[in-house]
């Protein structure tokens, strides 16, 4: 369950389209891509504290790592849970589209996509591996879990809210085990961009517009009524894969376009 929090409330879709065209125009000219539009999110320039960057996390491969492990790469960090029925499958679909564009631009080794759970009690490494296999996550993706205390500390540091809530009625059915779900996690939908020096540079707080995104059938079936509405009728406050590429272009200094379908 995603909390109804938006980063672009009240913005005009036409203004957003115009701003994206400006970024694209800058990228195609002699200068490097400029900062993303304020309609998309917030430009920041804050070093991630070592007390957070060095916290131990566990990858889907069962290896211990930390956010500091990707210094030297641009990191796109998002919160998620594998049992989200409203927005996380849509976010994953958009990130897959973005990754294809990054790879097509020859930047796969310079950009790391990281999905860090807000449900550490259920999202074990083995479950994250199953999710990776299900969605076909590329090599430059990392799915992360950790102790509840570490997960809470990291997301509190970045200002991303989440909370355990009651499961809906009727409850959803786990796409992996076939069992009924017993609780849900309400959470903000955030995209955080860290530069190669490990500094937070841009943040987006909004739900995804996943029109045309590659969402696997199992996760489409897993969506609840709100999730299906989010997929078929995205509102004007949502972000698209094309829009979310602009911070990566800015931080890498390279033009990035979504490949033609």
Q: How would you name each of these model-derived features?
A:
Residues 50-52, 74, 186-188:
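Short, small/polar residue-rich loop motifs at catalytic or cofactor-binding pockets
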Residues 55-75:
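A short beta-strand-turn-helix
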Residues 68-95:
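Short active-site neighborhood of thiol/selenol oxidoreductases, capturing the structured segment around
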Residues 92-154:
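Structural microenvironment flanking redox-active thiols in thiol-disulfide oxidoreductases
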Residues 138-226:
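Thiol/selenol-based redox catalytic cores and closely related redox-interacting motifs
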Residues 197-261:
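C-terminal lobe and adjacent flexible extensions of AdoMet/dcAdoMet transferase-like proteins
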């Amino acid at each position: 369950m995603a909390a109804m929090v938006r980063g672009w409330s009240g913005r005009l879709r036409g203004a957003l389209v115009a701003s994206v065209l400006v970024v694209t125009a800058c990228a195609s000219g002699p200068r490097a891509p400029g900062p993303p539009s304020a309609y998309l999110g917030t430009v920041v320039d804050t070093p991630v504290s070592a007390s957070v960057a060095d916290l131990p996390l566990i990858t889907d491969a069962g290896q211990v790592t930390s956010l500091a492990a990707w210094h030297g790469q641009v990191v796109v960090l998002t919160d998620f849970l594998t049992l989200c029925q409203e927005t996380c499958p849509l976010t994953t679909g958009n990130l897959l589209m973005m990754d294809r564009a990054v790879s097509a631009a020859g930047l796969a080794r310079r950009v790391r996509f990281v999905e860090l759970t807000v449900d550490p009690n259920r999202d074990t490494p083995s479950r994250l591996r199953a999710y990776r296999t299900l969605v076909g996550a590329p090599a430059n993706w990392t799915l992360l879990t950790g102790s509840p205390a570490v997960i809470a500390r990291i997301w509190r540091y970045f200002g991303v809210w989440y909370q355990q809530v009651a499961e809906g009625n009727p409850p959803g059915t786990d796409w992996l085990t076939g069992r009924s779900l017993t609780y849900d996690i309400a959470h903000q939908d955030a995209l955080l961009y860290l530069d190669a020096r490990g500094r937070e540079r841009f943040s987006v707080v909004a739900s995804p517009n996943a029109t045309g995104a590659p969402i696997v059938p199992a996760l489409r079936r897993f969506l609840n009524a709100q999730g299906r509405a989010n997929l078929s009728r995205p509102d004007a406050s949502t972000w698209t894969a094309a829009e979310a590429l602009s911070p990566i272009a800015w931080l890498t200094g390279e033009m990035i376009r979504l490949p033609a379908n």
